[in-house]
Amino acid sequence: MSEIDLEDLPGVGATTAEKLREAGYGTVESVATATTSDLAEAAEIGEATAKKVILAARKMADIGGFKTGRDILDKRKDIKKLRTLVPEFDELVGGGLETQAITEVYGEFGSGKSQLVHQMAVNAQLPEELGGLGGGVIYVDTENTFRPERIEQMLNGLPEEAEIGEIEEVLERIHVARAHSSDHQMLLLETARELANDLRTSDYPVRLFVIDSLTSLFRSEYAGRGTLAPRQQKLNRHMHDLLKLIDDHNAVGLVTNQVMSNPGILFGDPTKPIGGNIVGHTATFRLYLRKSKGGKRVARLVDSPNLPEGEAAFMVEQAGLKPC
């Protein structure tokens, strides 16, 4: 990450830099990936000035141009994996959930989506050698599903060698915000950026961003086909804001999604996730969870840029996610 201060950018003085930081643009990289209109509004400057600042930031941060495949390979060496600690599940997703990528988990009610994100909120705090990321968590809760009691049960269910502190310490590293509308949900990502920047040099920098659930508020507020276009535009921006966040902090993006039935499918599973192509194209990995016999859950890897489709079974127990 760049060590350049915002004040080093041409046209950005102390006052403008402070306004940018308050709006969530705490790094040169975040300025470089901003839109002209957003930056102009945040810093209260003209769009022409904002454009110059963005171009300068892109040059100083060395982003925005073409890179060779080898450059991309070198960058991918920074990627970490967050494990579920269920061997079959981890094998399915290539060793764990990748940082700098959004993993979407969708399924019907009771399929285990919120159980998975609670488990990841615990596992993220484990040291890397034990499958974690040694970091904290930002958790945007849109359905009032976060339960600290569940975190405690999962903490107690970790392997004996996994020591990350008492429950109070673990909960202190999970920063939860309840979203009440789609606009509030989008605003919370801006607040999350500020918080993550503040924690960047702490013992537990943010390494996991959770949105549970991604689409529920958008779906309830934008009902009917006539509102589909504005809903998708907002959802698209929201997803890309999350992408910028996880890229800037080398973190995992983990979102849950609701489903609907597709009556046009006569054979096979008619269940499909909400959000259409916007969510489908922005999420790097897509996991479909469903209930199975004997209390089992099945995770199916539906989409990945580098992994084959496949399935893994697991159990949701009081102690957390466990192998079958």
Swiss-Prot record:
Binding site for ATP: G107, E108, F109, G110, S111, G112, K113, S114
GO BP terms in the entry: DNA recombination; DNA repair
Coiled coil: none
Molecular functions per Gene Ontology: ATP binding; ATP hydrolysis activity; ATP-dependent DNA damage sensor activity; damaged DNA binding
Keywords from the named record: ATP-binding, DNA damage, DNA recombination, DNA-binding, Nucleotide-binding
PROSITE patterns (alphabetical): RECA_2 (PS50162), RECA_3 (PS50163)
Any Pfam family matching the protein: HHH_5
Source taxon at top rank: Archaea
Annotated InterPro entries: AAA+_ATPase, DNA_recomb/repair_Rad51_C, DNA_recomb/repair_RadA, DNA_recomb/repair_RecA-like, DNA_repair_Rad51/TF_NusA_a-hlx, Hlx-hairpin-Hlx_DNA-bd_motif, P-loop_NTPase, RecA_ATP-bd
SUPFAM superfamilies: P-loop containing nucleoside triphosphate hydrolases, Rad51 N-terminal domain-like
Function: Involved in DNA repair and in homologous recombination. Binds and assemble on single-stranded DNA to form a nucleoprotein filament. Hydrolyzes ATP in a ssDNA-dependent manner and promotes DNA strand exchange between homologous DNA molecules.
Family stated for the protein in its record: Belongs to the eukaryotic RecA-like protein family.
Name of the protein described by the UniProt record: DNA repair and recombination protein RadA
Annotated organism of origin: Methanoculleus marisnigri (strain ATCC 35101 / DSM 1498 / JR1)
Designated gene of the protein: radA
